[in-house]
Amino acid sequence: MPATSLEGLVTNSGWTINKLIKNTSGSGGNFCTQYEATSPEGKTGFLKAMDLSNALNSGSLEVLQRTVSEYLFEQEILNHCRDQNLSKVVVPLDSGSVINPNFVQPLNQVYYIIFDFAEGDLRKEYINKEITSWSKVFRSLHHVGVGIKQLHNVGIVHQDIKPSNILCFANDESKISDLGRVTDDKGKSPFSQLTFTGDRSYAPVELHFNAIPRDDFIDRRYSDLHMYGSLIYHLISGVQLTPILINQTRELMSNAPLTSYEEALPFLKLAFGKMMEEFYNKCEEEFGEDISSELHEIVKELCYPDYKYRGNLKYSRKVQRLSLEKYISKMASIQRKTYITGIN
């Protein structure tokens, strides 16, 4: 395929495409290839190339239009985030197309986007191996909260906040990546008709009962809040929140079918309360009472099973209740406390 043989080519902007890293399935099911790339100034970047050959070979104009639409939207939303100076979101260094001389038109044109080269992601750094620095974990989680808030402030909801989508860079900086399936308040996203666009295994529990709130665009923030709290829970406990919650709820119901969200909600709350008690005890053992109380409050409010009572209940208006300001502040406070108490 054209996108798998770009090594040695140079883009119009001067980036040299170096070694191939891997092939992946892109956000819209398109075939993507990842490379290291070097700028004219010697900066190392990460290049994601999109191969349109699958869409072209399908013989379907609809498939081709959808594929191009998804790519153009991702490029547009990334450029928008860059222009808005979203410091905790991964934005492009360059984008465009490169001609592969080994193929004929139109297959020879390969679209690409280049990003800063990351050192890893939260899954590789903190889940797949033993955590050696909790202060770095909390710093990363603070950055994630800031990144989600930045997206919300410019009318974007991510809905796929998970460890592999949080990239780690030099100087212990973390940023949110993979904006290919986000939705926006202007309705430009090709995925606007979907109530949830991310990984279902990390999704809030209401999704599993087809009870996702859908009255207003801001309701999509319920998912981002839950996924942020779930990320905190995952990094500390080592397990994903939603699958455990569903399993424990089924045990409470003696494995009877969970027919509706409303019927399951009392059992979900009971199971969630037990999980939060266990989470608090684990945090207290690891970090002490003060920090564990803050972490318990954050996760409980962000992941509460009844989404109508999720977020900062001090406020009744959604724009304030679904704001991450309180939780960003608390994560900053936890960072300071780990430093003061000598927790590494």
Where are the regions that the model predicts?
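Conserved C-lobe activation region of Hanks-type protein kinase-like domains
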Residues: 218-223, 232-288
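Activation segment signature within eukaryotic-like protein kinase domains
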Residues: 140-141
